[in-house]
């Protein structure tokens, strides 16, 4: 699902997890050596800000906080160059992310704070109709809430995200494990 927000143009896309190319987090588990960590212009760690943006919404819906998974973040970061090459949002193949879900976002380079990026997914809650997935959207189209339902999915315990920046765009890729948005399961 691709949608736009009203500020500049931001595009969000649905269910998986995120790898973060940002400031090293100081988390107890060191990221794998192949993870490229860049100094972030976002101030505090990108990891902490993305995690907080997810966990605020989860708390409001009675879901346990997500834990950061550096391996999911590395996997997310590795997909950023592919998005940059095609210049649009397209989910990675499920074969490349077994057992994981993925949320994607795209916006003008440097125009959005991490909270606004995740906020585009969280804004989908306005269409949420609690029920059994996929019958959970007041619009009748589950894709209109799929990013948000993945953010708050109670069975998901870990997330890892990355921001990939090219000359024109920032891409946020988040990967989630275990994946959510499972048909026949209750939301929230």
Which functions belong to the PLM regions below?
Residues 2-14:
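Bacterial N-terminal signal peptides that target proteins for export
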Residues 12-22:
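Bacterial N-terminal signal peptides
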Residues 26-29, 35:
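Boundary at the C-terminal end of the N-terminal hydrophobic targeting segment
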Residues 34-88:
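A short alpha-helix/helix-coil micro-patch that ends at or immediately precedes a cysteine
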Residues 54, 90-93, 147:
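Histidine-centered active-site/metal-ligand motif
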Residues 69, 95-97:
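Short, glycine-/polar-rich solvent-exposed loops and beta-turns at beta-strand/coil boundaries
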Residues 83-95, 127-133:
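Cytochrome P450 catalytic domain signature, combining two hallmark sequence patches
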Residues 98-188:
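A well-ordered secondary-structure block
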């Amino acid at each position: 699902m691709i949608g736009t927000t009203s500020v500049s143009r931001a595009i969000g896309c649905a269910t998986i997890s995120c790898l973060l190319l940002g400031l090293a987090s100081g988390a107890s588990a060191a990221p794998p050596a192949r993870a490229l960590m860049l100094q972030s212009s976002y101030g505090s760690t990108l990891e902490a800000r993305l995690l907080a943006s997810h966990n605020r919404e989860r708390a409001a819906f009675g879901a346990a906080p997500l834990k950061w998974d550096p391996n999911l973040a590395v996997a997310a970061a590795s997909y950023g160059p592919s998005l940059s090459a095609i210049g649009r949002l397209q989910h990675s193949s499920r074969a490349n992310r077994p057992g994981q879900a993925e949320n994607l976002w795209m916006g003008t380079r440097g125009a959005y704070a991490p909270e606004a990026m995740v906020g585009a997914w969280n804004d989908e809650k306005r269409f949420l109709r609690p029920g059994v997935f996929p019958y959970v959207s007041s619009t009748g189209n589950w894709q209109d809430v799929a990013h948000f339902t993945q953010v708050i999915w109670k069975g998901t315990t870990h997330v890892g995200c990355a921001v990939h920046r090219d000359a024109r765009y920032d891409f946020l890729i988040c990967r989630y494990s275990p994946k959510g948005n499972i048909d026949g399961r209750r939301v929230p």
